[in-house]
A protein has these predicted regions:
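Short beta-strand/loop motif that positions the catalytic acidic residue
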Residues: 193, 199-201
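Conserved hydrolase catalytic core segment
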Residues: 65-110
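Conserved HGGG/HGGXW glycine-rich cap/lid loop of the alpha/beta-hydrolase fold
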Residues: 1-37
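Active-site loop/oxyanion-hole signature of alpha/beta-hydrolase fold enzymes
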Residues: 28-71, 84, 91, 245
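Acidic catalytic loop of the alpha/beta-hydrolase fold
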Residues: 204-208
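Conserved alpha/beta-hydrolase catalytic His-Asp/Glu region
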Residues: 106-109, 130-191
């Protein structure tokens, strides 16, 4: 099973679910370039497609032939791009099942928060430079449905800030524009996937919660949906047991 993290965090996102998932699957997680403990080159052209390339190269290096994939947030669209390549016969391995957690699968149903808008704009580098642990906590708590422990947020902040990670955030967040430009390709990737697709969504997420769930039901009526009441943008932190139950994995 591949576990694809979101923005602006890292594969540490999966820590609460790791013990249960590892009892059922051989797990593979990595920090994509610009995230977590991976390199954060300033001159790199960050994109969702480049992140999909990284995952494709990794899977090939591990000799994996068939995989299930769970993704969140930014990772959702990395998975959409991998599915698009699979539909085109260009993916050198087989995705058998895909599970999506809260993320902007459909740009028209996604509502970025203020910090995302500021990072995306012309003052993004200044905003990133002035960011702090306190502001990070405020942003993360604004999109959560359940309380987030300060120690956990501290770990995530340390991984984000590692190797001057704040400096590349304005570059990476251009993925929001990339989603808009590739909306048709990545929506079609889901509609033409021909494999089981499942969306697990926390309904208290102001970015990609109920609106994404409603859009999923309209565009993908034959695919499954689980709504976790009271959870926000990070159901894998806030309600790991609910996510595992939705995935039919014993917690």
């Amino acid at each position: 099973m591949l576990l694809i993290h979101g923005f602006p965090t890292s594969s540490f996102d999966w820590a609460a679910m790791w013990p249960a998932l590892s009892a059922a699957y051989s797990l593979h997680a990595l920090d994509m370039l610009g995230f977590g403990l991976s390199d954060k080159p300033k001159a790199f052209l960050y994109s969702l497609s480049a992140s999909a390339d990284q995952w494709q190269d990794y899977v090939l290096s591990q000799g994996l032939r068939e995989v299930d994939v769970v993704a969140h947030d930014y990772g959702d669209t990395v998975l959409q791009e991998l599915l698009a390549r699979q539909n085109e016969g260009r993916l050198p391995f087989r995705i058998q099942r895909a599970t999506f957690l809260n993320g902007g699968l459909f740009p028209e149903a996604t509502f970025p928060i203020l910090m995302q808008k500021l990072l995306l704009g012309p003052l993004g580098p200044v905003v990133a430079r002035l960011s702090s642990f306190g502001r990070f906590c405020a942003s993360m708590r604004s999109i959560a449905g359940a309380p987030l422990a300060e120690q956990e947020l501290q770990w995530h902040w340390q991984l984000l800030a590692h190797d001057n990670g704040r400096a590349v955030m304005p570059k990476i967040i251009q993925y929001i524009q990339e989603r808009r430009h590739n909306r048709a390709r990545w929506t079609s990737a889901l509609q033409q996937a021909g494999i089981p697709l499942h969306l697990i969504v926390g309904d208290r997420d102001p970015i990609s919660g109920k609106t994404i769930a409603a859009r999923w039901q309209k565009l993908l009526p034959n695919c499954t949906l689980t709504v976790l009441e009271g959870a926000g943008h990070y159901p894998q932190w806030e309600a790991p047991g609910g996510v595992l139950t939705a995935m039919d994995v014993a917690s």
